A protein has these predicted regions:
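Short terminal alpha-helical segments
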Residues: 1-38
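Intrinsic-disorder-associated interaction segments
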Residues: 3, 7, 42, 49, ...
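A structural signal for alpha-helix termini and helix-coil/disorder junctions
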Residues: 20, 35, 39, 62, ...
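Amphipathic alpha-helical interaction modules
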Residues: 25-69
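Amphipathic alpha-helical binding modules
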Residues: 70-112
């Protein structure tokens, strides 16, 4: 079950979705957008903007699904607490798998 429909992959739609599913991340979202726009101007390329939109679409996709968000944040937290590289790797593997799956789903045009 998702909290909200999948937003369009546009700055305004992603920010609005972030405000609902992860309001604590709004300042990070705004900083990332500003950084991507500055890099786009500096390099004369839209690649930084596309990367920022893809990254935030994946994060919003994770946050849209509370159970997935809990697993993702738990894995990141446990990786930070890990006492061995192997333990950290195990938790980061879980987090990265969830992120990759979310990135795949967030690239789809149809809301679910």
């Amino acid at each position: 079950m998702s909290l909200i429909p999948r937003p369009e992959r546009s700055p305004g739609a992603l920010r609005a979705a972030c405000a609902v599913v992860a309001p604590g991340l709004l300042s990070a979202y705004d900083r990332a957008k500003d950084r991507a726009l500055a890099e786009a101007v500096e390099h004369g390329s839209l690649k930084p903007v596309h990367a920022y939109l893809a990254h935030w679409a994946a994060l919003i996709e994770i946050e849209r699904h509370p159970a997935v968000a809990r697993r993702y944040h738990c894995a990141e937290y446990l990786a930070r607490l890990a006492t061995t590289p192997e333990e950290a790797r195990e938790h980061l593997t879980t987090a990265s798998a969830l992120y990759r799956e979310a990135a795949t789903w967030s690239g789809q045009a149809v809301s679910s």
